[in-house]
């Protein structure tokens, strides 16, 4: 089941969103502040966060930046601030979507599901290739009795490659699929993620490897 973190200093909004999420079979974890949300994340995995901007202490912009950079969690801003400058700052902070108050909770749920689809978190599927099992629900890799949890983007990148063995993916294709077509960062971030994945696969003694195809991109090979 999808785990959704909702952060807002208004308890009425927290209860309102949580009750509707639960009817849609989405687990809701409500927190009144950015600091409380980060404390929760020390012990609880979530798939997506809905974040207010105007909060005491850590505001929504700061929280969004931390969620994206430290936890790699997709974020939807939910706020009464509708100025273009606020939206610009939110997207610079890393938000995946922006919803203004007052809002229709059904629309918020539509947007949550749309962002989850973009991140491929809407499925509980497992995939096994060689001696490696990938659990998409928990972002876990397993080889024999060894289990490893990955950051979201690393897992989705590996899952995409493993789902199409021997197909070559260019950096541009990977960025569009994993980071989104509007990503403005350095495409070399793909190389960094690939390097980390190779290290993790080696540590697990997986038979799956990620190969570089010179001048083209990356593909996976299973050595059994």
UniProtKB/Swiss-Prot annotation:
Modification type 4-aspartylphosphate: residues: 52
Molecular function via GO: phosphorelay response regulator activity; transcription cis-regulatory region binding
Pfam families, per the entry: Response_reg, Trans_reg_C
GO terms (BP aspect): regulation of DNA-templated transcription
Subcellular location: Cytoplasm
Cellular compartments per GO CC: cytosol; protein-DNA complex
Lineage top rank: taxon: Bacteria
Disulfide bonds, paired cysteine numbers: none
Location of the Response regulatory domain: 3-116
Organism: Staphylococcus aureus (strain NCTC 8325 / PS 47)
Organism ancestry: Bacteria, Bacillati, Bacillota, Bacilli, Bacillales
PTM remark: Phosphorylated by HssS.
Function: Member of the two-component regulatory system HssS/HssR involved in intracellular heme homeostasis and tempering of staphylococcal virulence. Phosphorylated HssR binds to a direct repeat sequence within hrtAB promoter and activates the expression of hrtAB, an efflux pump, in response to extracellular heme, hemin, hemoglobin or blood.
Signal sequence bounds: none
Keywords carried by this UniProt record: Activator, Cytoplasm, DNA-binding, Phosphoprotein, Transcription, Transcription regulation, Two-component regulatory system, Virulence
Feature: DNA-binding region: 124-222
Protein name in UniProt: Heme response regulator HssR
């Amino acid at each position: 089941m999808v785990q959704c973190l909702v952060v807002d200093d208004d308890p009425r909004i927290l209860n309102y969103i949580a009750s509707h999420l639960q009817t849609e079979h989405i687990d809701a974890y409500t927190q009144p502040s950015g600091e409380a949300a980060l404390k929760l994340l020390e012990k609880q995995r979530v798939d997506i966060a809905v974040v207010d901007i105007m909060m005491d202490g850590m505001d929504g912009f700061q929280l969004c930046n931390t969620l994206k950079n430290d936890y790699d969690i997709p974020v939807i801003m939910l706020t009464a601030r509708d100025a273009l400058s606020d939206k610009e700052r939110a997207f610079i902070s890393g938000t995946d979507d922006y919803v203004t108050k007052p809002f229709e909770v059904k629309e918020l749920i539509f947007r949550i599901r749309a962002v989850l689809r973009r991140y491929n978190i809407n499925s509980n599927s497992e995939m096994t290739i060689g001696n490696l099992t990938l659990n998409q629900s928990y972002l876990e890799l397993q080889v024999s009795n060894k289990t490893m949890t990955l950051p979201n983007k690393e897992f989705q990148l590996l899952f995409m490659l493993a789902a199409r063995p021997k197909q070559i993916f260019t950096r541009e294709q990977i960025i569009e699929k994993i980071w989104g077509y509007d990503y403005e960062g350095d495409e070399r971030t793909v190389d960094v993620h690939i390097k980390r994945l190779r290290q993790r696969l080696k540590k697990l003694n997986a038979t799956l490897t990620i190969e570089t195809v010179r001048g083209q991109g990356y593909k996976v090979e299973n050595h059994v």
